[in-house]
Amino acid sequence: MARVEGQVALITGAARGQGRSHAIKLAEEGADVILVDVPNDVVDIGYPLGTADELDQTAKDVENLGRKAIVIHADVRDLESLTAEVDRAVSTLGRLDIVSANAGIASVPFLSHDIPDNTWRQMIDINLTGVWHTAKVAVPHILAGERGGSIVLTSSAAGLKGYAQISHYSAAKHGVVGLMRSLALELAPHRVRVNSLHPTQVNTPMIQNEGTYRIFSPDLENPTREDFEIASTTTNALPIPWVESVDVSNALLFLVSEDARYITGAAIPVDAGTTLK
């Protein structure tokens, strides 16, 4: 039997990258999915966000596996819209069991005292408040099912250690850990488990862009992907520059499956050993 057969999962940031990979992995294991993403570039972060066409492609990939997919165009910062759309989707599919609060952004580097106020607020609003909004919207549906459930919050290696020039990102990702631990305590009596994932660099458009290259090679005027690959490898204990989205999806599948039935409140690195350094 598939590991999440007959369950329904909510995934934010589902247009591409880790979110699409999570959707496909869970569909392969028997879940129907609710896919959330922003359909256009609502923020200026130095690289393009996922598109409506990419979100539709994720849905097609899921449906090609014989599972149902509902697409939601919503910004995780907009609680009212997110609530209405998720309520509608859960009503259609009849239940909610799994949540992957995966939506997030990266940023160009700044020294902490040079971060523009709007850049700081945007980071916290999406990478922390957006995760809380996702949980806030989803938890009542999981509790209504009285079957337990699993919530996985996407943090980062930067949620477990500090990094220079991205304090706004690191602060948001550390905040996700605190939120995860509080939710785990609150929801444990209902057999709802809450954990967080902490990847190192993941090979997606979120890192394959000029802003990230500059973070890892600050002494180079115009760093390239090859420069980034060399610099990124030095940050990991294992001799690799990054992991792939499926590596994170494999960890997520474990956490939401019965294999992890007694794991809650855990911060799980998928980091090639970067938090050891």
UniProtKB/Swiss-Prot annotation:
GO terms for biological process: limonene catabolic process. It holds the Pfam family adh_short. The keyword Transferase does not apply. Induction: By limonene and carveol. One of its GO terms (molecular function) is oxidoreductase activity. The active site is at 169 (proton acceptor). It catalyses: (1S,5R)-carveol + NAD(+) = (R)-carvone + NADH + H(+); (1S,5S)-carveol + NAD(+) = (S)-carvone + NADH + H(+). Substrate binds at residue 156. Optimum temperature is 50 degrees Celsius. It is an enzyme of class 1 (oxidoreductase). Its EC number is 1.1.1.n4. Optimum pH is 5.5. Shows 25% of the optimal activity at pH 4.6 and 7.0. Catalyzes the oxidation of carveol to carvone, with a strong stereoselectivity since it efficiently converts only the (6S)-stereoisomers, of which (-)-(4R,6S)-trans-carveol is the better substrate. Displays a broad substrate specificity with a preference for substituted cyclohexanols, and does not catalyze the oxidation of primary or short chain aliphatic secondary alcohols. Is also able, albeit more slowly, to oxidize limonene-1,2-diol into 1-hydroxy-2-oxolimonene. In vitro, is only active in the presence of the artificial electron acceptor dichlorophenolindophenol (DCPIP). The physiological electron acceptor that is used to regenerate NAD(+) in vivo is unknown. Belongs to the short-chain dehydrogenases/reductases (SDR) family. This is (-)-trans-carveol dehydrogenase. The lineage of its organism: Bacteria, Bacillati, Actinomycetota, Actinomycetes, Mycobacteriales.
